[in-house]
Amino acid sequence: DHLPPASPDSPNRPTGLVPLGVFVAVDTDESVTVTVPRPDMGQGPRTSLAMTVAEELEVDWTAVRVRQAPAGSEYGDQTSGGSTSTRVHHRGMLLAGATAREMLVRAAAAAWGVPRESCRATAGTVEHSPTGRRLTYGSLAESAAAMGVPPASEVTLKSPAEYTIVGRPTSRIDNPDVVTGRAVYGSDVRVPG
């Protein structure tokens, strides 16, 4: 049979996280959870797509957690094959990270009553450049989510020349779960009946 779509009260939905769009959520402990839409069949999209989001979000890679998307149309095509996951989702995940960053910057600017242009995201915080004041992503997440997702036309992607995470060597983010047996695979899922 098949797995039903995730509902708001589903155990597959993370708790304690503030969603900033479909693929990014921020917690008050300053961690960021990236929901990856494609299963990992060995090529590492859980790591590469999370790196892509972290790059645009301006968050430390060590603060990133990954969650596999549950069944649901909001996550788009969830198939895997032909080593296409990273190629197909790269730009969309860049946009997801950049959109979350823009939401957090706007929330900080509103909190300080300053122009958005005077604020910038850096290392999991938003800084007001003229004064050096900072607010953490965790402290801004609720107000950022309440402001809503800006249109893509109002979101700017970084230049690849500015990348500090993408293109750098790293271990796969899910290696600890794989080697300790905590990773959940399709064969681990039990459907009632």
Enumerate the predicted regions with their spans.
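Cofactor-binding beta-sheet edge motifs in enzyme active sites
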Residues: 1-193
